[in-house]
Swiss-Prot record:
GO cellular component, one term: cytoplasm
InterPro entries according to UniProt: Chaperonin_Cpn60_CS, Cpn60/GroEL, Cpn60/GroEL/TCP-1, GroEL-like_apical_dom_sf, GROEL-like_equatorial_sf, TCP-1-like_intermed_sf
Top enzyme class: isomerase
UniProt-annotated binding residues for ATP: 29-32, 86-90, 413, 492
Domain of life assignment: Bacteria
Keyword field contains Chaperone: yes
Main localization category: cytoplasm
The protein, known as: Chaperonin GroEL
Catalytic reactions of this protein: ATP + H2O + a folded polypeptide = ADP + phosphate + an unfolded polypeptide
BP GO terms, sorted: protein refolding
Amino acid sequence: MAKQIIFGEKVRVSLKKGVDTLANTVRVTLGPKGHPVALERKWGAPTVIDDGVTIARDIELPDAFENMGAQLVKEAATRTSDAAGDGTTTSIVLAQALINEAFKNIAAGAEPINLKRGIEKAVAALKAQLRKNSTPVKGKQQIVQVATITGKDPEIGNLIADVMDKVGKDGVITIEESRGLRYETSYVEGMQFDRGYISAYFVTDPGRMESVMEDATILMTDRKIETVAELLPALEKILQISKNLVIVAENVEAEALATLVVNKLRGNLNILAVKAPGYGDRQKAMLEDMAILTGGHVISKEAGRKLDSVTEADLGHARRIVSNKDKTTIIDGEGSAEAIKDRIKQIKAQIEETESAFDREKLQERQAALVGGVAVIAVGAATETEMKERKARVEDALAATRAAIEEGILPGGGTGLLNALPCLDALKLEGDEATGVNIVRKALIEPVRWIATNAGKDGNVIVDKVKNSPVGHGYNAENDVFGDMAEMGIIDPTMVVRSALENAASIANMVLITDSLVADIQEKAPAAPGPEAAGMY
């Protein structure tokens, strides 16, 4: 296909238009008084949502070059979401500010590569300062505060805190849709392991890039499945029992994987293939744990069994299995409670006997997976649109809470970034590198400015007041007051703030040193025939 190419100033104009279009759409959601955005769906009612990354993922621009700018900024939000689960709108706001300020300086004659160096040095200093300013999460009340701010609902804050109190900070928590009208929690047998789906073709929820399998039948094996010949006899047997199949194997590849994908796409089989966790003997032990939890048996090469020997008794069952690219969660396995207790006793005995610290740690992980179970938060609402919006807020609140526990917290509402600004004074740079630092300095006020603007205030006035306030003091947009942010319960996870800054700067640096764009020339679709052409050949 023929290509269209643009250079220099045209590149910056196109990228800026794309960046601004996406960022202007998303930034209205920032803060407690942010406004939601309605997303059109191919079927059903529009989704009304205030989650930055979800909105960004839905945006595609008609102009190919402008769309490149939008997609690059979208990448900042996606990376932040993957790393910290929150802060996606902040990362987009920061990226837009960095890019626009950098383009102004490039137009005035600044050298892009030197601006990039200055931005990188400023961000490195800020990250170190954010870590210094961070304080650990203390007690359940601060967990409530973090979850409440991100979820924008005290009920969500208390819900997350209660669940984490029961399953522990590393416990497995899943979020489901419910037919009820309120939030409900339950604790079920289950486990989570650090392996995801083998192919993205198994995804059932493209928005979250997850594969969700209800009433799952599970085939577990320590074999590598490569050919159709070894897979087909087992599939034919299983299809007589269930159409919802999850295969957990050492690997599924080559023509075997292609066969599963084709059958999935054609709708012949609702299937998910997942790599087995661990390696060697540990993999065998974890597969056995999984089999006991789900009431099945492992098709083991050590026992001389092949896939075609599978029987109904070998298949495990679970109410629900959720898998993404990194991890898989088995919820409500149908294994015998007595067998699970016996397995836990066996692992405890191994922990007491082992002398290896590494082996002990891995055994404790297996024990925790079987003992801890899975907490399930069911989200209900009066309409499907409201339920999806609520579910997204609960997911964001859970991710932010985990981030806060891991790296600590900072004053919220954009105050954490402003408090870190003085560290840039220690950077003794010259020329365009110093300009790069000033670009970052200007960009860091944007989150506070947009939180205030979305609350109906003059953003610049609010920024000046916060800058002149004591450290840790900021603007509470919810109640329209200034004060100590921590005392008011307005706190942000350090990981969220750091990730938003880091990813925004990374994408901005890519954009500002880009000097040419290449895109396909879109062919115009042929005009539809007129009425007089009907029936002609």
